[in-house]
From Swiss-Prot:
Gene Ontology, cellular component aspect: cytoplasm
Subunit relationships: Homotetramer.
Catalytic reactions of this protein: L-citrulline + L-aspartate + ATP = 2-(N(omega)-L-arginino)succinate + AMP + diphosphate + H(+)
One Pfam family of this chain: Arginosuc_syn_C
Top EC class for this record: ligase
Superkingdom to which the source organism belongs: Bacteria
Name of this chain's protein: Argininosuccinate synthase
Length: 393
């Protein structure tokens, strides 16, 4: 092994992994941190890596690329995994893996490493991404190789090797946290008992609905070709738009869920997720589609969505089948343009209006007071033909 690129967060796990790689492979380690909106102190991460004698440190702001090229395409499909999960962690891994391989090529590294555990989905997502971008890359997964099997053993290793362990880490925080611009997730520790209610003081993006404002807030989101581009008629970049929706949704307790999900490797996992902006976007996008998509096109999208969601959850972002589905989904968005008005109040998102220059909604046809060009007697033949199998079964 000549050189290794490590996906590095500066937390306890990857700080220990950095030292472990240096010791066990006796080669140079390059660190890469993707800024996806997790609000970490990037300068502190750089200093911590430098203190471990790392010469090449890549800390890159990928927020706009993350939202534009990964989050928005996923939301065009109204993607939800197992009815609730908006895939905030899953959708971040393909971008990190892609850029990690690019840095490996740039620096002449012949291996990459990650800090995902041997029980989780992320090891699969990262490594599928690596091999999709470079089939010949060597992959190092320390959690599947070393003898450090607990958080206490990591802390002892860190202390032994002079690695700074923040006080909150040493005192074992109750949850394992993953964050980016789309969501924040909490897993492990007390959440491992699925019957115990979480301590919601852990939340970082939102207040719980009970503590949210007593006054509802109305907002408008504008869409073009299926993607949001403005809030209240103010154009925003993809990352800034999602960030603004997080702020708005967070103060109204939007998008807090507590779920047990089925991991790809077969383990059930309980987690709490905050996705305020994404939850608002999901409601808004479905609303604008409701007046701009033909019925059969809308139903076809609903049929393929679970398959598309499973591909992303299981780490298959770079596959041919995901790209095929994406092409179909993207084509469906050609006329998904317009404005959606929403009412936010104590954890709920209510669509209260939608309008589009491409609207397929006909007031004359829908009205109880007007028939338009619809003849009520035509329904008789329609019913008789479509009920043949029911009357003859």
């Amino acid at each position: 092994m000549k050189k290794i690129v490590l996906a590095y967060s500066g937390g306890l796990d990857t700080s220990v992994i950095l030292k472990w790689l240096q010791e066990n492979y006796n080669c140079e380690v390059v660190v890469f941190t993707a800024d996806l909106g997790q609000n970490d102190d990037m300068s502190a991460i750089r200093q911590k890596a430098a203190a471990s004698n790392v010469k090449e440190i890549f800390i890159e702001d990928l927020k706009e690329e993350f939202v534009k090229d990964f989050v928005f395409p996923m939301f065009r499909a109204n993607t939800v995994y197992e009815g609730y999960y908006l895939l905030g962690t899953s959708i971040a891994r393909p971008l990190i893996a892609k850029r990690q391989i690019e840095i490996a090529h740039l620096t002449g590294a012949d291996a990459v490493a990650h800090g995902a555990t041997g029980k989780g989905n992320d090891q699969i997502r990262f490594e599928f991404g690596y091999y999709s971008c470079d089939p010949n890359i060597k992959v190092i997964a320390p959690w599947r190789q070393w003898e450090l099997t607990s958080r206490n053993s990591l802390i002892e290793y860190a202390k032994k090797h002079g690695i700074d362990v923040p006080l909150d880490k040493a005192s074992e925080p109750p949850y394992s946290i993953d964050a980016n611009l789309l969501h924040t997730s909490y897993e492990g520790k007390s959440l491992e008992d699925p019957y115990i209610e979480p301590d919601y003081t852990m939340l970082s993006k939102s207040v719980i609905p009970e503590l949210a404002s007593d006054t509802p807030e109305y907002i408008e989101i504008s869409f073009k070709n299926g993607d949001p581009h403005a809030i209240n008629n103010v154009p925003l970049s993809p990352a800034n738009l999602l960030q603004q929706l997080n702020i708005i949704g967070g103060r109204h307790g939007i998008g807090i869920i507590d779920i047990v999900e089925n991991r790809y490797i077969g383990i059930k996992s309980r987690g709490v997720y905050e996705t305020p902006g994404g939850t608002i976007l999901l409601h808004a996008h479905r609303a604008i589609e409701s007046i701009t998509l033909d019925r059969e096109a809308a139903h076809l999208k609903d049929e393929i969505m679970p398959r598309y969601a499973k591909l992303i959850y299981n780490g298959y972002w770079w596959t041919t089948e995901r790209k095929m589905l994406q092409a179909l989904i993207d084509k469906s968005q050609d006329k998904v343009n317009g404005v959606v008005r929403l009412k936010l109040y104590k954890g709920s998102v209510m669509v209260v209006g939608r309008t589009s220059e491409n609207s397929l909604y006909s007031h004359n046809l829908a009205s109880f007071d007007s028939s338009g060009n619809y003849n009520h007697t035509d329904a008789e033949g329609f019913i008789k033909i479509n009920s043949l199998r029911l009357r003859n079964s």
